[in-house]
A protein has these predicted regions:
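Mid-to-C-terminal Rossmann-like scaffold of FAD/NAD(P)H-dependent oxidoreductases
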Residues: 9-105
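Generic low-complexity, intrinsically disordered sequence content enriched
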Residues: 25-28, 114, 133
Length: 135
């Protein structure tokens, strides 16, 4: 009891499995949760993982974890941008966005809100994804 760990290599339960989220943001979020618990503000750590990487002329931004997916929706954007939306059944698990910060931010917020839009809406380039955040 009263043993805590935090950092980018500390493991945690996520989706019923023990994993490590090796990212700076996760290390910061875990440390904040541990600090809250140390001072008596009891709370569980329930992360909404996100990552980014610059690979030459491509900015990759990831929200969520795509493990266990069985369906992918692809959204083709402008100027060679693209995003991949990963689902298990009808539940949105993750979004990988290449050079598409708008899709990344919308996907991240949808995951945080627990919303899972239909694949057909994601793939429809004429559909305004931002409208999904309003309901």
């Amino acid at each position: 009891k009263n043993i805590w760990s935090a950092g980018d290599c500390a493991s945690l339960l996520f989706g019923g499995k023990r994993i490590r989220l090796e990212s700076v943001q996760n290390a910061i979020d875990q440390a904040e949760c541990v600090a809250d618990n140390i001072v008596g503000n009891k709370r569980e750590y329930s992360p909404h993982p996100w990552f980014w990487s610059d690979q030459y002329d491509t900015k990759l931004q990831i929200a969520g974890l795509n493990t266990g997916y069985n369906k992918i929706a692809t959204r083709i954007g402008e100027n060679s941008s693209v995003s991949y939306w990963y689902y298990r059944a009808d539940k949105l698990l993750a979004v990988d966005a290449m050079n598409d910060p708008r899709c990344y931010m919308i996907g991240k917020r949808l995951i945080e809100m627990g919303k899972s839009p239909e694949c057909e809406l994601i793939e429809d380039i004429n559909f305004d994804l931002k409208s999904l955040l309003e309901t």
